[in-house]
Every structure is written in C-alpha cells, then in structure tokens.
C-alpha cells in the first residue's frame, strides 16, 4: 500500500526519520521545540520503540521511512464513551435535540431493542472505527438499570477479551443514584461490576439525599475495591452543583480510590468565587475531570428557535491550572445524545481546540487525548512515545499545528507494534440488520 506523504518500510527494524512529535507525549528524549513540537528520528525494532534520536542522526544502515517533518503521535486514549448506545440514531432519533428528548429516546430504545446481540453488534462496529482512527484505550459507560446491567456487562466482558490485543477496554456502570434506594438492585449491580473488573458510576442530581447517596456509593466502592466515574452537572442550571458535594464526600469518607467526574457543565455558570472554591475542593479531593466538548455544545443551551448563548463546556483551563487532572473525550456517537461522531480522537481534539480555546499556545494541548486520559485511566504505558514502549503510533502528513487542525487527517497511517494496520472503516450498511435499512 502506498501513502502520499511517506512509505512505511516492511521491515522488523526501521526508523521514522525527520518526524515532528508533540513533546508532551514523548518519554526518554528531549530536544529543541517550537510550539511544543520537536524533531526526532524514531527507531523501531521488533514492534518496540528502541530509541528516539535527534532528527537525521539514526544509524544509516536502518531502513527508513522519511516523515518529511510529518507529525508522529502515540495512539489515543478515549476516556468517556457510550459504546452501548452507539449508532441507534437511525432507529431512535432525538426529535428536538434536547437533553430530555435524548433521555426519553434512549430509554425507549433500550427497553425495546437492547438484546445481547444488538449491543454486541453496535459495540464492535464502534470499536472497529476507533481502532482504524488510532485509538488503543477506551472507557465506556454502560446503562445499568435492571435487567440491562447483566446483559451489557456480560457482552462487554466478552468484547473486551476479543479486543484485548487491539484496544484496552474499561467499563463503568451508569445509573441514576436515586436507584440505590433499592438495596437488592444496588448490591447486585455492585457484584456485577466487581466481577467484570469495572467501575461504579452514576448520574448525580441535586436533591436532599445527595450527600447520603454519595456516601453509600463511595462506601460500596471502597468495600469492593472499585474506582468511581460519574456523570456530573450536565445542565446549564447554575442552581445545580453536585460537583462540590462529590468532592466533599470523597474527603469526608477518606476515599483512596480514583474518582472521575465527567461533564461538569454548570461549573461554568457559577460566580467566580463559587467556581474557584469548588475547583479548590476538587483539587483537594484528587478528582479528575473530563470535558466532552462536542456533546456538551450539541445539547447545552438548546432551545427551539433560539441561538445558544454559551458553549456548554466546563472550566477546563481553571481546573488544569489548579492541578486537577483534565482530559477531553468523544462521549456519545450517533445516538440521541449526539447525532454525529465516529470515535475519532483527532476530531475530538480538533473541536476541543476550537470550543475550549486550547490554542495560543498549543504547546501541551496534545495531552488531552493522549497522556492525560491514559494516566487518569491508570494506563501510563499508553498515549506516550516512550523508549522501550510499543511502537503504537499514528503518522500524519501535517507538519505544523495549522496543518494538523485544518484538515481531518484522513490520510493518517496507524502502526500497531510497528506494523501498518488496515484503516478501512466499517460500512454503515453492516448495521442494517439491527438498526434497519
């Protein structure tokens, strides 16, 4: 196969010469940088990165793929997705694009259609797309109201095993915390999650019982050795701020597991003093935050006949400045919560730069879809170009940020263990058997 910008060698040992790499993703090499980009030769041997050298200094006897200053990134980490919901849009669209419309549409579709075969077909379709785009780590939230929790976690466990050599998968139980009032259900859900090696999650809502609910969730997580990943404050309502309650609960219970909060949209609607105090508490509690810029911009401040007044995203800059681990992710894909998307972290990154103003400078921006989410997910071996690490790399013709962010990079080349993979995307027609033609 030929590529317009480089010719990958068919050899066990070779060098990607004259590459441009985001410095924030590189381990074991430093050099002069401009806008956070360095020039390097990357030596690959037997599927591993053997060395990272100054550009133009690799041993002459090695087979070479001249990148001609094209970028080389590590494979991506997509830390907040919904593989169980993916691609149901054609079967159950959101009639008005609203958050409540999405909830109702998904509930109806789940109750009518989410058999094991249906979930597996759509989940694997999504993973094939993600793999082709260059992703090697995904965390998915799974709708976990009974009896769906047992159906979806069983399918997930099977799919995780089948895909373990391509994409590392993690799963989070997603359910309204109000349902913990049913002790039998919550005990069964916790057992299912523990046996599947998953995480406890849920949707937090402002109510008089929020502190007790969070205490119960955290104690269950601690007793079962589970981490927590929550859907938080996905609303424009400034009266809603459960993020502060979550941080207080983590500190109150002395929880030592990892806690992640996704969305946190209403934080951006708070007065400066309230926002700053909340961010300080989040930092003290050691909570990580993931923003979902495409889905948040799609859903938030949507009112018929009215132009949206805000972007829907959380205070990512302020959180990061306070030392809070932060990242961005895909969220929903072609379902009632987001009608578009393909689990492509390049698209997510490109849109995040625009929506969240991650540019000017872009020096460390690449971290939000590589090193940061991988670290939050407990996989520091992923999302990095590291000496001794796997040659899991994504090669681009783009040489500079302006080039990278101005086109979809559809001509990218993905290497896994130093070998070029087939980047053919699955045909949507394959879903006709479950979604309908």
UniProtKB/Swiss-Prot annotation:
Binding site for substrate: 85, 331-332
Single Gene Ontology BP annotation: cytosine catabolic process
Pfam families noted in UniProt: Amidohydro_3 (PF07969)
Function text: Catalyzes the deamination of many pterin metabolites, such as formylpterin, pterin-6-carboxylate, pterin-7-carboxylate, pterin, hydroxymethylpterin, biopterin, D-(+)-neopterin, isoxanthopterin, sepiapterin, folate, xanthopterin, and 7,8-dihydrohydroxymethylpterin. May be involved in a degradative pathway for catabolizing pterin rings.
Protein's recorded name: Pterin deaminase
Source organism of this protein record: Rhizobium rhizogenes (strain K84 / ATCC BAA-868)
Family: Belongs to the metallo-dependent hydrolases superfamily. Pterin deaminase family.
Broad EC category: hydrolase
């Amino acid at each position: 196969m030929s590529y317009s910008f480089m010719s990958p060698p068919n050899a066990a040992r070779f060098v990607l010469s004259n590459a441009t790499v985001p410095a924030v993703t590189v381990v074991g090499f430093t050099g002069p940088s401009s806008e956070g980009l360095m020039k390097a030769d990357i030596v690959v041997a037997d599927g591993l990165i053997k060395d990272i050298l100054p550009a133009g200094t690799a041993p002459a006897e090695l087979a070479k793929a001249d990148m001609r200053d094209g970028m080389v990134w590590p494979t991506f980490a997509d830390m907040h997705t919904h593989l169980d919901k993916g691609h149901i849009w054609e079967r159950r669209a959101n009639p008005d694009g609203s958050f409540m419309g999405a909830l109702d549409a998904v509930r109806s579709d789940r109750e009518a259609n989410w058999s094991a075969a249906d979930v597996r077909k759509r989940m694997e379709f999504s993973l094939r797309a993600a793999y082709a785009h260059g992703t090697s780590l995904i965390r998915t939230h799974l709708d976990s109201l009974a009896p769906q929790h047992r159906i979806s976690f069983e399918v997930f466990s099977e799919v995780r095993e089948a895909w373990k050599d391509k994409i590392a998968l993690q799963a989070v139980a997603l359910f309204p915390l109000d349902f913990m009032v049913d002790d039998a259900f919550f005990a069964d859900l916790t057992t299912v999650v523990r046996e599947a090696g998953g995480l406890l999650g849920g949707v937090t809502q402002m109510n008089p019982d929020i502190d007790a609910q969070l205490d119960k969730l955290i104690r269950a997580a601690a007793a079962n050795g589970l981490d927590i990943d929550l859907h938080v404050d996905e609303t424009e309502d400034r009266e809603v701020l459960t993020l502060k309650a979550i941080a207080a609960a983590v500190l109150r219970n002395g929880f030592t597991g990892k806690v992640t909060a996704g969305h946190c949209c209403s934080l951006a609607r708070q007065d400066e003093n309230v926002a700053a105090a909340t961010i300080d508490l989040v930092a003290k509690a050691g909570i990580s935050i993931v923003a979902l810029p495409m889905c948040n911009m799609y859903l938030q401040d949507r009112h018929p006949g009215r132009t949206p007044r805000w972007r829907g995203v959380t205070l990512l800059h302020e959180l990061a400045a306070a030392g809070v681990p932060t990242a961005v992710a895909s969220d929903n894909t072609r379902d009632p919560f987001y009608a578009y998307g393909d689990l492509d972290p390049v698209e997510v990154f490109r849109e995040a730069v625009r929506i969240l103003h991650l540019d000017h400078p872009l020096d460390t921006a690449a971290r939000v879809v590589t090193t940061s989410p991988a670290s939050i997910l407990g996989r520091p071996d992923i999302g990095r170009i590291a000496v001794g690490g796997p040659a899991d790399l994504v090669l681009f013709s783009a040489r500079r940020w302006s080039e990278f962010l101005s086109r979809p990079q559809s001509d990218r080349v993905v290497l896994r263990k130093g070998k070029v993979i087939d980047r053919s995307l699955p045909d949507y027609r394959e879903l006709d058997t479950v979604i309908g033609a």
